[in-house]
């Protein structure tokens, strides 16, 4: 997958040079490039923002440099243009799975009080992380790209790495344990030490369902419970 990020602050995405995403880039599974929107402004002072018409606090990103940056990237990349903003569709795991199937994606990060409305016709999709405000689109773009990238084949090395995680199948993840067997008087559940794979699978499924029911009842209501799920929930 190839990802282009249009931003005023390319250095904020240096985080993708490290850890799993960094290794995936080195191994050729991901290609992430940043494009500085400021490089496309025609303003001799490299200015990319101005006061809003009608008054109001803050500054608004001017349309020319953003549109020219999008057009330049689109000449070589045909991916969807995605804007991170509060009016967008709320991002979730299902959206991450769908976007991970794309060969190319182009992200546009807004800043200040937003982007001139006349730029919006160039966006194929608008995404929001939720009902809260961030200092810029970059802060929202990072987790979105990370969530999508880790689902790209080869990035994690194995599909099992993400299939057991929270949200993948509409439930929260079951509890995880590692050494030591006993810590501060609390022991690892015996079933995990049994070596009985079927019993371990059932225990994990039950815990996943119980945790989801307790902490995210909104998610639990959407789960299509199997006969086994119902039996597990009734068991002690």
Curated annotation (Swiss-Prot):
- Physiological role: Specifically methylates guanosine-37 in various tRNAs.
**Gene3D superfamilies reported for this sequence:** 3.40.1280.10, tRNA(m1g37)methyltransferase, domain 2
Name of this protein: tRNA (guanine-N(1)-)-methyltransferase
EC numbers, comma separated:
2.1.1.228
Which Pfam families does its entry note?
A: tRNA_m1G_MT
Localization: Cytoplasm
**Stated family:** Belongs to the RNA methyltransferase TrmD family.
Check the record and name the HAMAP family matching this protein.
TrmD
What keyword terms does UniProt attach to this protein? Cytoplasm, Methyltransferase, S-adenosyl-L-methionine, Transferase, tRNA processing
- Which reaction(s) does the protein catalyse, per the Swiss-Prot or TrEMBL entry? guanosine(37) in tRNA + S-adenosyl-L-methionine = N(1)-methylguanosine(37) in tRNA + S-adenosyl-L-homocysteine + H(+)
Which Gene Ontology BP terms does the record give?
tRNA N1-guanine methylation
Organism name: Clostridium perfringens (strain ATCC 13124 / DSM 756 / JCM 1290 / NCIMB 6125 / NCTC 8237 / Type A)
Q: How does it assemble?
A: Homodimer.
Name of the top EC class for this enzyme: transferase
